[in-house]
Swiss-Prot record:
Species annotation: Cupriavidus necator (strain ATCC 17699 / DSM 428 / KCTC 22496 / NCIMB 10442 / H16 / Stanier 337)
Protein's name according to its UniProt entry: CTP synthase
Gene transcribed to yield this protein: pyrG
Record note on quaternary structure: Homotetramer.
Pathway: Pyrimidine metabolism; CTP biosynthesis via de novo pathway; CTP from UDP: step 2/2
Residue positions binding ATP: 14-19, 71
C-alpha cells in the first residue's frame, strides 16, 4: 500500500514547499523507494493555463498534455518519475467534478456539502494520482498542499489530509510543515513566534507535524531549535533548519544531513537502504567548479519575473553542469529593444528568445533575432522564438517585408505564421480549433514524436527522432515553406501527419549555429542527464566566445 507524506506551508507563501518536497522525494528515491509527488492547488481556476505569468509564473506541461503548476517541473527534475495530469489538481477541478456528479444524481438527493463530499473527492483525487505512477505500486507519495495554513482556500485540502490520516491509520501518513523563522535586523535575532503560531494553527485543524522545516536566511542555532521544539510540541531532532542555499541542488544533502528522511521512514515504518546522494554531490561540484563561463541573453517580456521561465533557466544550468560551464543569464526586456539599445546584445555569447503569447514586445524580439543572425551570434528560438525567427527571415531574406503572424496582425499580406485549426494529438485523435475557441485547454499540448531530417544540426543533436512537449496555438504556415527554403532556411523536423514544421535552422554557410524549435525542450531537461539541445547550444556559445577572442 502507498504511504503518504503531506507537505504544508505556514506564515507566508513562496517558502519553497515544492523544492522541499522534491528534495525529500529525491532522498527517499536514493534509498531505493518508489516515489511520486502530487501538487494540490487551492485556486478555483481549472488549471493555470490561462493565468498571467505575473500571477502564477511558468505553466509546466506534462507528457500527457496537462497544463500544471511549475512545482511539477521541480518534481521531474529531482526524481525519475514522470508527472501526469493526475499529479496536479485544483479546487476548480474538484468542484467541477462534484457538481457533475450532483447533476447526474450520484448523490441520491443528498445535500452536497464541503464535508463530506468535497473532502471525499479530494481524497479520491489524491489516491488516483498516487496510483498513476509505478503501475500503482509507489511506496511513498508526497503531496504538496498549496497556499498557507490559515488561508480559507486551503481548509478543505487540509481537512481531507486529516481524514486520510485517520482513515489509513498510524504509520501510513506523515506531515511535514514548512515555516518561516525571520531574522529581524533591528533586533539582531531570529524570531520563532510566527512558527509557533503556524504550528498551533495546524494543530487546531487536527494535524500534528512529524517534522518542521524552518526556513531562514541562515542556519538556525540549536537553542532556537530547542525553543521551537518546546512550543510546537515536536522533538528537537524533527526541527530541521533549512537556510538559503545558492543552489537548489544542495537541498537534498542539507535535509539528509539533519535526518529528515530517517524521521519520515521511522514514522511510516519503512526500512530502506541508506541514502546515496553521490549524484547530487557530483552535480553541485560541477556547478561550483566550472572550467568556462558564458553569458546568454534571454530576450522576453516577463524578464522582471524569472519564475515565468523557471524550467528554461534550470535547463541552461543543467547544460552548464554537463559542459563544465558557468552559464550567466542576462535578462533583456524586448520592449526596450524596439526603440534601439541593440548595443546591449554585443557582449553576449548567445541569444535566446523563449516562448510567449501576444503582440507586446515582439518587434523587439525580432530585432534581437536579426542582430544574432547578422552578427553570427548563436541563436536558439523556442516556440514563439522559432516563429519570430521565421518572420525575421521572411522579412529580410525571403522578400516578404510585411511578413507576420496572424496572432499579431490578421491583415498581414504574408501570414508566415498562422493559427493551426486541425491536427492529430499524441493519441491519434483529430483536434480542431478556431479563433472563437475557448482559451483554456485548447492548444496543441503534450509530447509528440517527430522524425528528423538527416544531415542537419537537428539530427546531430537528437538523432533520427524528436520526442518533445508542445504548448502553442500557432504554427509556421506550410504555404510559405517552399519560399523560405529557397531563400536558404532548412526545415529539419516536421510532424508525420500534417507535415508541420517542428524545427528550423540555418546552414553553416549562413550562420554557425541558428536553431528554432516549435516545442518546449526545457520541460524534459534534468540535472541528472541535461538535455542534448541545450548542451549543443552552450557548446556553440563557447565556440562563439573563442572565435571572438581569437
Amino acid at each position: 500500500m502507498t504511504k503518504f507524506v503531506f507537505v504544508t506551508g505556514g506564515v507566508v507563501s513562496s517558502l519553497g514547499k515544492g523544492i522541499a518536497a522534491a528534495s525529500l522525494a529525491a532522498i527517499l528515491e536514493s534509498r531505493g523507494l518508489k516515489v511520486t509527488l502530487l501538487k494540490l492547488d487551492p485556486y478555483i481556476n481549472v488549471d493555470p493555463g490561462t493565468m498571467s505569468p505575473f500571477q502564477h509564473g511558468e505553466v509546466f506541461v506534462t507528457e500527457d498534455g496537462a497544463e500544471t503548476d511549475l512545482d511539477l517541473g521541480h518534481y521531474e527534475r529531482f526524481v525519475s518519475a514522470k508527472m501526469r495530469k493526475s499529479n496536479n489538481f485544483t479546487t476548480g477541478q474538484i468542484y467541477e467534478s462534484v457538481i457533475r456528479k450532483e447533476r447526474r444524481g450520484e448523490y441520491l438527493g443528498k445535500t452536497v456539502q464541503v464535508i463530506p463530499h468535497i473532502t471525499n473527492e479530494i481524497q479520491a483525487f489524491v489516491e488516483r494520482g498516487a496510483a498513476a505512477s509505478h503501475d500503482g505500486k509507489a511506496d511513498v507519495a508526497l503531496v504538496e498542499i498549496g497556499g498557507t495554513v490559515g488561508d480559507i482556500e486551503s481548509l478543505p485540502f487540509l481537512e481531507a489530509a486529516r481524514q486520510m490520516s485517520l482513515r489509513m491509520g498510524r504509520n501510513h501518513c506523515a506531515f511535514v510543515h514548512l515555516t518561516l523563522v525571520p531574522f529581524i535586523a533591528s533586533a539582531g535575532e531570529l524570531k520563532t513566534k510566527p512558527t509557533q503560531h503556524s504550528v498551533q494553527k495546524l494543530r487546531e485543524i487536527g494535524i500534528s507535524p512529524t517534522a518542521l522545516l524552518c526556513r531562514a536566511d541562515r542556519p538556525i542555532p540549536d537553542d532556537e531549535r530547542a525553543k521551537i521544539s518546546l512550543f510546537a510540541n515536536i522533538p528537537q531532532d524533527a526541527v530541521i533548519s533549512v537556510w538559503d542555499a545558492d543552489s537548489i541542488y544542495k537541498i537534498p544533502q542539507m535535509l539528509n544531513e539533519q535526518g529528515l528522511d530517517r524521521l519520515i521512514c521511522e514514522e511510516l515504518r519503512l526500512d530502506p537502504k541508506p541514502a546515496d546522494l553521490s549524484m547530487w554531490q557530483k552535480l553541485v561540484n560541477a556547478q561550483e567548479n566550472p572550467e568556462h563561463e558564458i553569458t546568454i541573453g534571454m530576450v522576453g517580456k516577463y524578464v522582471d519575473l524569472t519564475e515565468s521561465y523557471k524550467s528554461l533557466i534550470e535547463a541552461l544550468r543543467h547544460a552548464g553542469m554537463h559542459t563544465a560551464t558557468r552559464v550567466n543569464i542576462e535578462y533583456i526586456d524586448s520592449e526596450e529593444l524596439e526603440s534601439g539599445h541593440l548595443e546591449v546584445l554585443a557582449p553576449l555569447d548567445a541569444i535566446l528568445v523563449p516562448g510567449g503569447f501576444g503582440k507586446r514586445g515582439t518587434e523587439g524580439k525580432i530585432r534581437a533575432i536579426q542582430y544574432a543572425r547578422e552578427n553570427k551570434i548563436p541563436y536558439l528560438g523556442i516556440c514563439l522564438g522559432m516563429q519570430l525567427a521565421v518572420i525575421e527571415f521572411a522579412r529580410h531574406l525571403a522578400g516578404m517585408t510585411d511578413a507576420n503572424s496572424t496572432e499579431f496582425n490578421l491583415e498581414t499580406e504574408h501570414p508566415v505564421v498562422a493559427l493551426i485549426t486541425e491536427w492529430v494529438d499524441r493519441e491519434g485523435k483529430v483536434e480542431q480549433r478556431s479563433a472563437d475557441s475557448d482559451l483554456g485547454g485548447t492548444m496543441r499540448l503534450g509530447a509528440q514524436r517527430v522524425p528528423v531530417k538527416e544531415g542537419t544540426k537537428a539530427a546531430t543533436i537528437y538523432g533520427a527522432e524528436v520526442n518533445e512537449r508542445h504548448r502553442h496555438r500557432y504554427e509556421v504556415n506550410n504555404h510559405y515553406v517552399p519560399t523560405l527554403e529557397k531563400a536558404g532556411m532548412v526545415i529539419s523536423a516536421r510532424t508525420p501527419t500534417e507535415n508541420l514544421p517542428e524545427m528550423m535552422e540555418l546552414p553553416e554557410s549562413m550562420h554557425p549555429w541558428f536553431v528554432g524549435v516549435q516545442f518546449h525542450p526545457e520541460f524534459t531537461s534534468t540535472p541528472r542527464d541535461g538535455h542534448p539541445l541545450f548542451k549543443a547550444y552552450v557548446e556553440a556559445a563557447l565556440a562563439s566566445q573563442q572565435r571572438k577572442g581569437a
